[in-house]
């Protein structure tokens, strides 16, 4: 028989008022923080991904697709020069 760790059971935790007071504040706060992180564009800046209007520029309208197996480094250099 296993010993008790002295912790509260899961049923006791989720039926307590304290649990719901804490989580009724933190869960919506995390959702709002994530929504603001994405909607303000900060996610694009932090992760370095291009914004939706920056995928295709005036000078580069084609898809940067690597087609050759052995000359892939040259193709990558060509794509990076077009930025």
Swiss-Prot record:
Alphabetical keyword list: Chloroplast, Electron transport, Heme, Iron, Membrane, Metal-binding, Photosynthesis, Photosystem II, Plastid, Thylakoid, Transmembrane, Transmembrane helix, Transport
Residue ranges of the TM segments: 21-35
Cofactor binding remark: With its partner (PsbF) binds heme. PSII binds additional chlorophylls, carotenoids and specific lipids.
Principal place of residence: plastid
Protein function: This b-type cytochrome is tightly associated with the reaction center of photosystem II (PSII). PSII is a light-driven water:plastoquinone oxidoreductase that uses light energy to abstract electrons from H(2)O, generating O(2) and a proton gradient subsequently used for ATP formation. It consists of a core antenna complex that captures photons, and an electron transfer chain that converts photonic excitation into a charge separation.
Official protein name in the record: Cytochrome b559 subunit alpha
Domain of life: Eukaryota
Cofactor needs: heme b
The family this protein is said to belong to: Belongs to the PsbE/PsbF family.
Subunit structure: Heterodimer of an alpha subunit and a beta subunit. PSII is composed of 1 copy each of membrane proteins PsbA, PsbB, PsbC, PsbD, PsbE, PsbF, PsbH, PsbI, PsbJ, PsbK, PsbL, PsbM, PsbT, PsbX, PsbY, PsbZ, Psb30/Ycf12, at least 3 peripheral proteins of the oxygen-evolving complex and a large number of cofactors. It forms dimeric complexes.
Record carries keyword Metal-binding: yes
Source organism of the structure: Oenothera berteroana (Bertero's evening primrose)
Record-listed heme binding positions: 23
PROSITE patterns documented for this protein: CYTOCHROME_B559
Example GO molecular function: iron ion binding
Locations listed in the record: Plastid, Chloroplast thylakoid membrane
GO cellular component: chloroplast thylakoid membrane; photosystem II reaction center
